[in-house]
Amino acid sequence: MVDKRGIGDYIFDFFNVLILILLTIVTLYPFLYVVSASFSKTGMMQGASLIPHGGVSLEAYKLVFKNPNILTGYMNTIIILVCGTTLNLFLTSMGAYIVSRKQFALRKPLMLMMIFTMYFSGGMIPRYLLINNTLGLGNNLLALILPGAISVYNLIVMRTNFENIPVSLEESARLDGANDFTILFRIILPLSKAIIAVMVLFYGVAHWNAWFDAVLFIRERNMYPLQIILREILISSSTESMMTGVAGGDQFAMSENIKYATIIVATLPILAVYPFIQKYFVKGVMIGAVKG
């Protein structure tokens, strides 16, 4: 087979590969630097290299996992993640199913109302008063779950995916006596595994990284999510209580080590889960974003 590609095509491929390599380096280097620095005995690196200065040490990780605040933050974040993502998937799939059915007369006005909320809101103070005073969710983990129960963007993506499923399947199920709940949970959702995986990723990462709502609504330390603990460690001297028994001259280095180690501990669960759902990611986004 004759290769009909010209010199311009090869130049284009070369620059594509070059740009991708540069983007990979820019993306991976900061993460690898933090990983290496977290194992460094001095909390520093040898110049711009990824070689830990002073050798390798696991002391920072031992101190991190001995800190009860971090373990409590992990537990709270996992509770928020599991309960929040489950609620997100349930409500988003039901909402997407409703507005994807052409026989539903109010689907267009309902979609316009939801899209309006994507661009306009009452502001931070009314939101705080609503959640804290009217709903009485102050200092309650539900304040971190219920307000974001449905993402309109995710609902639109899932709705488009549902619209791509052949209507004949629904019609056949109705002839057999199936109702809307049966059609959604036994036909539509089993055929939408890719988009469900994408929704789990989107909602899960959002819950894992969320911290601002916790600053607003959570007052007791035993209810802090992990990201609040991480924020305190990074911007304050809260590492001092974790370094009992560390010599004075080594405290600065150990403080830096603890900060790096805490970042890795807070990031690791998402990094561990992502490879297992990555194969669904591109497929799900393409199915949900392009109709036809």
Give the predicted meaning of each segment:
Residues 1-292:
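A hydrophobic, multi-pass inner-membrane permease signature
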